[in-house]
Amino acid sequence: MSKGPGPGGSAASSAPPAATAQVLQAQPEKPQHYTYLKEFRTEQCPLFVQHKCTQHRPYTCFHWHFVNQRRRRSIRRRDGTFNYSPDVYCTKYDEATGLCPEGDECPFLHRTTGDTERRYHLRYYKTGICIHETDSKGNCTKNGLHCAFAHGPHDLRSPVYDIRELQAMEALQNGQTTVEGSIEGQTAGAASHAMIEKILSEEPRWQETAYVLGNYKTEPCKKPPRLCRQGYACPYYHNSKDRRRSPRKHKYRSSPCPNVKHGDEWGDPGKCENGDACQYCHTRTEQQFHPEIYKSTKCNDMQQSGSCPRGPFCAFAHVEQPPLSDDLQPSSTVSSPTQPGPVLYMPSAAGDSVPVSPSSPHAPDLSTLLCRNSNLGSPSNLCGSPPGSIRKPPNLEGIVFPGESGLAPGSYKKAPGFEREDQVGAEYLKNFKCQAKLKPHSLEPRSQEQPLLQPKQDMLGILPVGSPLTSSISSSITSSLAATPPSPAGTSSVPGMNANALPFYPTSDTVESVIESALDDLDLNEFGVAALEKTFDNSTVPHPGSITIGGSLLQSSAPVNIPGSLGSSASFHSASPSPPVSLSSHFLQQPQGHLSQSENTFLGTSASHGSLGLNGMNSSIWEHFASGSFSPGTFPAFLSGPGAAELARLRQELEEANGTIKQWEESWKQAKQACDAWKKEAEEAGERASAAGAECELAREQRDALEGQVKKLQEELERLHSGPDPQALPTFSDLEALSLSTLYSLQKQLRAHLEQVDKAVFHMQSVKCLKCQEQNRAVLPCQHAVLCELCAEGSECPVCQPSRAHTLQS
């Protein structure tokens, strides 16, 4: 979380002693600033009370939800003092409950959630520049919509001072101002620059980009906690969320750690179990200052206001540098009679550029400059990196050419990690062009590789044209040529093409390299190559016009180049299977002293040693085979005798190998079909298992429901048996098992019930008919009410006839 300016380090405009009364007057506030100062988190959210607030998680609501989030409005009284201090915290305030014994009249600062009372105080709100950038909507990427710090000069406001602070400032203004105190009387923008100038004066190396990239926020701040007054200008970390692992000691990617960052919020780095050994970023600082992302995007503050408060500690680019052009020499530096070569501007100790001629004895080695701070030391470092490598292109910031402010390519408004394989390959190609133009390479590395490539050349010379093995070997030799530094060559007549140009992708991960590795495992002695060459040497006589292929001589004259046909670029786009012609006749006119004897043997001819085809092979070889009358895949006419039989056997073995490969492909297809069938059966079995599981779950739920019903019925039955009104008595054996006190209680209950039953019987006898005992009694003509109407019709009154009544009663 960004730190606001400290109590003594906040940006403010100085007030002279005569203007104290004027400063105490109420200053006008912008409408948005006034709204936040007056209403932010001062009232409870009405929607949260109804559980309808949608800004609770994450908590971004303008109003407070809990008491510990409540903020008191800061007010400056008529006497010039604040209603509560903007710096001194209350020791009685409970941060959990949000209650203070002195209530709102407490003269000290309450540490509410987010420290809102201090951040949105009249003294500090929007008086300092935020160190974090803004998103597309203009909101702070760290603190969100309610950021208490200014984003640009237009968002700054002048602080409101307490009368006591003004008096202290007047006292300091009378000649006792220190370096720290001088920051008090500056504007917000000047204060931030003053802080940066202070730290740069203590350690000038912070002005170097490489030093910032390697050391920024990697060491803890030496000042006590919460007493560092430099704020965002401090290059040291103050907590774990601000810490950055040194990229020199720890290797990690530019992607955030999923255990630390959830959504847009960075959590505690301690939640990651891997700790410092994690391969991902743990803090926003680590991600912004990662070597892959650092200075890869333009600074928003520089685009909006033309200045950045973070200065050299900003992770974004401040100066747009022109990209490296294809031709490293601009038009203004073309060689002239008065200017024999390109003029280089070398950085001096004073920081400016000094022109140095390449022929000057003080001119440094250009290859050393090109390879400084990069991996251009060897060709393997250039071409051996596999696709997808996160290594950035070599940096060429050590050389400055006329008309260019720098050679380091600057590209902005791109997502982090935009260095794809194709762009890396393009940068490698540009760097090779730079080396080829500035300093001729030695041919020793290429000549050292000839013994390794010689067996493959011999294999190429004895195999028929158009065979798969021949094309594989030619492709592998192409890869070998591409892996060596480019040799000096004349400018081709075809624009935009270079015979020494590198392949676009590193050659270590191509199909040719795989075949080349397979050929390294072959023993060429098994093919009888030595005997075949011996036969050729004995049966042929070399002459000046003959062509050498892998040490063997072919009785044929050297090819003749047709004038005017070399300027066309049709050979580069030809769709025919014939090999391409040579690139340019300029190669034929080069002195032979440029190439070593081993390289002449490798290229295959002494007359046209510099003429290379598209694939890096000698074009005269292809012209010789193309001029023949045989088709691809047939044997040349010069091959006869035992060598032809041996080649026929080799070709038969190759065909058998191809047939075996086809059989393996068929077997693989059958296995794949069987695997697909098994996979389908497994999916169906899984679906059936899922359906059975669902049915089992349904049956389990039904069983649980029935068990619940049985349990309820048992409880109801027990309640009936043990309740105050038992419906049935236990058996005699059960009574004996009861205790005497329980029996007494049961007897008492039964007697009470018996009395109730007697009363009910007596009542029913008094109202029911004495004869049927079902219908209610009716008044008879004799004025007696003992029988019902039905019984009175068929019988006489039992009262009038006592004997009858006695009979009925009995």
UniProtKB/Swiss-Prot annotation:
A zinc finger (C3H1-type) spans 84-113, 124-154, 215-241, 251-285, 293-321. GO terms for molecular function: mRNA CDS binding; zinc ion binding. One of its GO terms (biological process) is regulation of translation. A zinc finger (RING-type) spans 766-801. SUPFAM superfamilies: CCCH zinc finger. Residues 586-602 have a biased composition (Polar residues). The modification Phosphoserine is found at S240, S374, S378, S385, S631. Keywords: Coiled coil, Cytoplasm, Metal-binding, Phosphoprotein, Repeat, Repressor, RNA-binding, Translation regulation, Zinc, Zinc-finger. Pfam families: zf-CCCH, zf-CCCH_11, zf-CCCH_UNK, zf-CCCH_UNK-like_4th, zf_CCCH_5. Its main location: cytoplasm. Belongs to the unkempt family. This is RING finger protein unkempt homolog.
